[in-house]
Swiss-Prot record:
Carbohydrate attachment residues: 27, 48, 344, 553
GO biological process: cell adhesion; homophilic cell adhesion via plasma membrane adhesion molecules
Residues spanning the membrane: 813-833
Entry membrane topology: Single-pass type I membrane protein
This protein's name: Protocadherin-11 X-linked
GO cellular component: a single term: plasma membrane
This protein's encoding gene: PCDH11X
Source organism per UniProt: Sus scrofa
Pfam families: Cadherin, Cadherin_2, Protocadherin
Length: 1117
């Protein structure tokens, strides 16, 4: 429970505690003569009504002043706030509380009703009226005569008549003064036990009547109010003869009781007083003191001679229940005797009860108008019954004389609330004359009655009723606008305007219909279309004219009858389906959906393919399209045809839609590296390169499309020192740290390119060789290091720090010069020997070979191959002697564009040809393969299903070959079998083609040296001769391999005679191990130290053949 709800509950509980009684009293104090609109109090705060939250009440809180019709209230109350203000009526305490005992409190009482019913309370408010000094004290007469005996002793005191001041307290009489008084007299003021201030005249000198018998002076009286008020009178003192005894009452205090119905003249009491004097001085005179009220003087008579008090006017206990009569007895002497007579007026049941009706609901012409839907306990009037009698005679009860839906609920002892006790119904009783009876408990009891008229106001409490709450209609479509459908009628039990009915369409009614609000006629104002909407269900309303109006609703169901006026409709004008290229025949291509808005036979649709398209079939009912062909995106990317839909109407209708089937690519192509073009290239990285510099960029392509061709690069091996990092998106290889001396040398990075194909991605890897050095002083040595790098585990780099130093460079130059000189001499010698042995026929064939297709032997060569096979049977056990191998160097003649290049032809023995050409169909089998990945199989176990390349027993083992690293299952390497492959495509723009052969080793390495900044491309030809020709093109080698740029124009041809049975295997850049079933081989670089991959043409991934990355189909033969 939240805090706000808890506060509300607390307020309600507190209100219940505070208002646990139905009535309350509240006292306020006001001063008389207050001006208009003075704030007296705030009932909302003073009664703690502000604790009740407004939202807990059905209606806002109201405060209503309950007063009698014709009364002029002295206060008013703001109904909404409960603030009490004075009105323009004069608040006069002396008038409101006339006749009360002096100094008694004066109260003014009103009642306030607090509404609504949930918190109804009747609050009795008593206003204590404080006196203000608005009256001046007055002497009983303007001339006061007093007689003083001449023998009065000095300081003798004589009472003077007291003044009358209606004000009380400090505003009453406070002091008396003599104005221009004689020195013979003084004035003193004494206070009686009743609090009355009595002036006394003091004799200050001896009097002598004979000398002066009359003294005249002024006496002034003042009150204590602010502003102070006063009055004066003439005091005339007569000096009289001596009287030295005053009268004495027999009883100083007398209390008598007399019924209020005592007749006028009845005796109340007899006073007795005596005087010791004789003669005239013994004659006693009785009179009322000026202190008694005017009402007492009016009601009672005192015989001045006898002292008998009688009733002067009829008594009324209800007006004044007791009277105090102060009687003075004087013999003409100085001080009169005093006696107090208390007259108690006893009650008799002489007053009938009175009924005072104070309306809470203001009447109109004396009649209360009450709505028939007034809630229970609606407060109508406050009934106050009073009886001026006392005790049982004043006990009054109030009730009604017969059964009515009203009751009187007591709130105070003599006040009742008239409220509704049941719900009213104008239709059953329209007017009530309530007779209120009030009876007292006297004997005999007296009663009073009063009539209260209540008129019940008719309310619109009966809603119209439809004769048919549900109405079902039918109308054919394509009707004429304005067609009358039916007439709707309703009845209302009310009368007058409450029974007048208007017909309305509900908010859910469509615009196709109209309803006359007077007659209730329903019409179709628009042409209806069943295909657009078959059924219309809406509501109609019947509303009377009452306030507030009441309404009821009925449901109308309009059914539109069908006509065949619509053709079949395809959900799309053109359908585009996407199917994978590996979707099998008769699989599901897609679903054609067609609808016919008509009904029944008119909506039965048959589907068919137009133009007798046999590639696809469609189910005439379901619209399922199935292929009769296999898809190949590379052959045809899309198919288009038209489908016809025809309905079964009497006059059939049809429509067509275009269908396009798009063949979606499947991730069936692995990434292919373009840069670097092979595993044998390298990039120079100066040691002064700043960290963050891009030193190389790897580029790979993928024949697939979309996400299948989206590539991500990563390093999966090498980079043992962590010098380099690669950007997975761009392939940029960046230097991570500053190079130090220990970092000089060749660094190998194994870079993986992985596509984002789904569900399975494909990948490939390549070697990136980064040579950290100031310059490339010996390219041959670097390529040799690259070659060794291939045979070295990826966890180890081939460092060349010593070779990069100036001293080692000089040593390498000298060694290279010596080796080159020896090689040239050896080549010249071998060439001369070979040429001497060659016949003219072989030379002619050798020249014709240069212009023939190098991959397809002619018939003459095939015959020579057969002859060589026969001869080699005899030479099968010939010893392997280096001296029997010759190299012949020929100068090629300028011929067109070929005069810019040098070639070297290597003639291999027939045994090598038998081991190569005899096992591969060069004329029919494509030999293209990818120069994209290093031969890493000797360092990893492949998870690929391809044949693996394994180290053979003939290969010299090294500890580095014993490190077998595990790759995750998603690393798939493309294997290359032991049979050599030729490629007509390469990333090197200078090479024409390449072949790799299974060999063991060249026992006499031969290398051709050009300038160090040269790169050489080797082209091998295998004509059907006793020797195998290898054509080597040499080109200038820049420090950084630059693709697409030609260099070098010299050309030489060299022929090598390989030892019998020799085999050479050079990696084609594909990953994987050799098939264990293939010929045993080892992996060595060519004698020239140049990797074959350096001489491929530009990579052409789109020219891949079925032989890429797979074992030769003839290798197992």
């Amino acid at each position: 429970m939240d805090l706000l709800s808890g506060t509300h509950i607390f307020a309600v509980l507190l209100a219940c505690i505070v208002f646990q009684s139905g009535a309350q009293e509240k006292n306020y104090t006001i001063r008389e003569e207050m001006p208009e609109n003075v704030l007296i109090g705030d009932l909302l705060k003073d009664l703690n009504l502000s604790l009740i939250p407004d939202r807990s009440l059905t209606t806002p809180m109201q405060f209503k002043l309950v007063y009698k019709t014709g009364d002029v209230p002295l206060i008013r109350i703001e109904e909404g706030t409960g603030e009490i203000f004075t009105t323009g009526a004069r608040i006069d305490r002396e008038k409101l509380c006339a006749g009360i005992v002096v100094d008694a409190h004066c109260f003014y009482e009103v009642e306030v009703a607090v509404l609504p019913d949930e918190i109804f309370r009747l609050v009795k408010i008593r206003f204590l009226i404080e006196d203000i000094n608005d009256n001046a004290p007055l002497f009983p007469a303007t001339v006061i005569n007093i007689s003083i005996p001449e023998n009065s002793a000095i300081n003798s005191r004589y009472a003077l008549p007291a003044t009358i001041d209606p004000d009380t307290g400090i505003n009453g009489v406070q002091n008396y003064h003599l104005i221009k008084g004689q020195s013979i007299f003084g004035l003193d003021v004494i206070e009686t036990p009743e609090g009355e201030k009595m002036p006394q005249l003091i004799v200050q000198k001896e009097l002598d009547r004979e000398e002066k018998d009359t003294y005249v002076m002024k006496i002034k009286v003042e009150d204590g109010g602010f502003p102070q008020r006063s009055s004066t009178a003439i005091l005339q003192v007569s000096v009289a003869d001596t009287n030295d005894n005053r009268p004495v009452f027999k009883e100083n205090e007398i209390e008598v009781s007399i019924p209020e119905n005592a007749p006028v003249g009845s005796s109340v009491t007899q006073l007795h007083a005596t005087d010791a004097d004789i003669g005239e001085n013994a004659k006693i005179h009785f009179y009322f003191s000026n202190l008694i009220s005017n009402m007492a003087k009016k009601l009672f008579h005192l015989n001045s001679t006898t002292g008998l008090i009688t009733i002067k006017e009829p008594l009324d206990r209800e007006e004044s229940p007791n009277h105090k009569l102060l009687v003075l007895a004087s013999d003409g002497g100085l001080t009169p005797a005093r006696a107090m007579v208390l007259v108690n007026v006893t009650d008799i049941n002489d007053n009938i009860p009175s009924i005072d009706i104070r309306y809470i609901i203001n009447p109109i012409n004396g009649t209360v108008v009450l709505s028939e839907n007034a809630p229970l306990n609606t407060k109508i009037a406050l009934i106050t019954v009073t009886d001026k009698d006392a005790d049982h005679n004043g006990w009054v009860s109030c009730f009604t004389d017969h059964e009515v839906p009203f009751r009187l609920r007591p709130v105070f002892s003599n006040q009742f609330l008239l409220e509704t006790a049941a719900y009213l119904d104008y239709e059953s009783t329209r007017e009530y004359a309530i007779k209120l009876l009030a009876a007292d408990a006297g004997k005999p009891p007296l009663n009073q009655s009063s009539m209260l008229l209540i008129k019940v106001k008719d309310e619109n409490d009966n809603a119209p009723v439809f004769t048919q709450p549900f109405l079902s209609l039918s109308v054919p479509e394509n009707n004429s606008p304005g067609t009358q459908l039916t007439k709707i009628s309703a009845m209302d039990a009310d009368s007058g305007r409450n029974a007048e009915i208007n017909y309305l369409l509900g908010f859910d009614a469509p615009s196709e219909f109209n309803l006359d609000h007077r007659t209730g006629i329903l019409t179709a104002v628009k042409k209806l279309d069943r295909e657009k909407q078959e059924k219309y269900s809406f509501t109609v309303l019947a509303k009377d004219n009452g306030m507030p109006p009441l309404m009821t609703n009925a449901t109308v169901l309009v059914t539109v009858l069908d006509q065949n006026d619509n053709s079949p409709v395809f959900t799309h004008n053109e359908y585009n389906f996407y199917v994978p290229e590996n979707l099998p025949r008769h699989g599901t291509v897609g679903l054609i959906t067609v609808t016919d808005p008509d009904y029944g036979e008119n909506s039965a649709v048959i589907l068919s393919i137009l133009d007798a398209n046999d590639d696809f079939t469609i189910d005439p009912q379901t619209g399922v399209i199935q292929p009769n062909i296999s898809f190949d995106r590379e052959k045809q990317e899309s198919y288009t045809f038209y489908v016809k839909a025809e309905d079964g109407g009497r006059i059939s209708r049809s429509s067509t839609a275009k269908v396009t089937i798009n063949v979606v690519d499947v991730n069936d192509n692995k990434p292919v590296f373009v840069v670097p073009s092979s595993n044998y290239s390298f990039e120079l990285v100066p040691p002064s390169t700043n960290p963050g510099t891009v030193v190389f960029t790897v580029v790979a392509i993928d024949n697939d499309t979309g996400m299948n061709a989206e590539l991500r690069y990563s390093m999966v091996g090498g980079n043992t020192k962590g010098l380099f990092i690669i950007d997975q998106t761009s392939g940029n290889i960046t230097l991570k740290e500053k190079c130090v001396f220990a970092d000089l040398g060749l660094h190998r990075l194994v870079v993986k390119a992985k596509d984002l194909g789904q569900p399975d991605s494909l990948f490939n890897v390549v070697n990136v060789n980064l040579f950290v050095n100031e310059s490339v002083t010996n390219a041959t040595l670097i390529y040799e290091l690259v070659r060794k790098n291939i045979e070295t585990p990826v966890t180890q780099n081939i460092e060349t720090t010593d070779a990069s130093s100036p001293s080692s460079d000089y040593v390498k130059i000298v060694v290279a010069i010596v080796a080159g000189t020896i090689t040239v001499i050896l080549v010249i010698f071998i060439t001369a020997v070979v040429r001497c042995q060659q016949s003219p026929h072989l030379k002619a064939a050798q020249k014709n070979k240069q212009n023939s297709e190098w991959v397809t032997p002619n018939p003459e060569n095939r015959q020579m191959i057969m002859m060589k096979k026969k001869k080699k049977k005899k030479k099968k056990h010939a010893p392997k002697n280096l001296l029997l191998n010759f190299v012949t160097i020929e100068e090629a003649k300028a011929d067109g564009a070929d005069n810019n290049r040098s070639s070297i032809t290597l003639d291999l023995p027939i045994e090598l040809e038998e081991q190569t050409m005899g096992k591969y169909n060069w004329g029919t089998t494509p030999t293209t393969f990818k120069p994209d990945s290093a031969d890493l199989a000797r360092h990893y176990k492949s998870a690929s299903p391809q044949p693996t390349f394994q180290i053979q027993p003939e290969t010299p083992l090294n500890s580095k070959h014993h490190i077998i690293q595990e790759l995750p299952l998603d690393n798939t390497f493309v294997g290359c079998d032991s049979i050599s492959k030729c490629s007509s495509s390469s990333s090197d723009p200078y090479s024409v083609s390449e072949c790799s052969y299974p060999v063991t080793t060249f026992k006499t390495p031969v290398s051709v040296h050009t300038r160090p900044p040269m790169k050489e491309a080797i082209r091998f030809h295998t004509p059907m001769k006793e020797t195998t020709t290898v054509e080597i093109w040499t080109h200038p080698q820049p420090q950084r391999k630059s693709e697409g740029k030609r260099a070098g124009k010299s050309q030489r041809r060299v022929t090598f005679h390989l030892p019998e049975g020799s085999q050479e295997s050079s990696s084609d850049g594909g990953l994987g191990d050799h098939d264990t079933g293939s010929l045993p081989s080892t992996s060595h670089a060519l004698p020239l130290g140049y990797p074959q991959e350096e001489y491929f043409d530009h990579a052409a991934p789109n020219n891949r053949t079925e032989g890429d990355g797979n074992s030769d189909p003839e290798s197992g033969k």
